C-alpha cells in the first residue's frame, strides 16, 4: 500500500505506541525500550541531513540490538561518569502520519516530530527533528524494525550524547 492509500488508516494506535515508547525513555526503562525492537531492529540518528546510509559515513547513533545492549549496560553502570547525575528527559511526539502501509504484511512506516529536552548536571539541552519508525505488527501492538531520528541540527557540534532520543 502506498502513501495515498495509507492516508485512510487510523493513526491513533501508532501515536499511542510512539507515546508509550517515549515514556519508557523518559522513565529510563531502557531494557523495556530495547524490547520494543525486532531481533534485527536498528536505531539510527544520522550525522548529516538527507544521509542515505549509516554505512558510508559516521552517524550520531547506529545501534543494532547488540550495540543497544552494550549502551544500556553502560548507562546502568553505577560509575558511568557521563551519567552522574543521570539525565532526566521529557519527550514530546506530534504530527504523526502513516507514510506507507502494507497491511497484508503488517508493516508500516510512521513519520512524526520529536522534541526531547534533557536535563543533567544543571544543564538543559534541546533536541528536535523528524523521526520515522518502520513498524511490524506483533499481536495487538507493534515492534520496531528501524527507528530513524533526523535531528534538525544533526550536522552541528554535540557534547557526548548518552541517552537515546
Residue locations for each model-derived region?
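General N-terminal targeting signals
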Residues: 25, 35, 41-42, 58-60, ...
Amino acid at each position: 500500500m502506498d502513501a495515498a492509500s495509507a492516508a485512510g488508516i487510523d493513526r491513533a494506535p501508532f501515536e499511542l505506541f510512539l507515546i508509550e515508547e517515549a515514556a519508557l525513555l523518559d522513565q529510563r526503562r531502557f531494557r523495556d525500550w530495547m524490547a520494543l525492537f525486532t531481533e534485527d531492529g536498528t536505531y539510527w540518528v544520522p550525522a548529516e541531513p538527507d544521509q542515505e546510509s549509516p554505512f558510508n559515513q559516521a552517524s550520531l547513533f547506529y545501534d543494532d540490538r547488540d550495540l543497544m545492549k552494550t549502551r544500556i549496560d553502560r548507562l546502568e553502570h553505577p560509575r558511568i561518569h557521563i551519567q552522574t547525575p543521570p539525565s532526566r528527559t521529557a519527550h514530546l511526539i506530534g504530527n504523526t502520519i502513516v507514510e506507507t502501509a502494507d497491511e497484508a504484511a503488517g508493516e508500516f512506516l510512521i513519520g512524526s516530530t520529536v522534541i526531547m529536552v534533557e536535563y543533567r548536571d544543571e544543564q538543559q539541552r534541546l533536541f528536535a527533528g523528524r523521526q520515522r519508525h518502520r513498524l511490524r505488527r506483533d499481536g495487538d501492538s507493534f515492534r520496531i524494525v528501524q527507528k530513524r531520528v533526523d535531528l534538525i541540527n544533526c550536522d552541528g557540534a554535540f557534547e557526548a550524547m548518552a541517552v537515546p532520543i
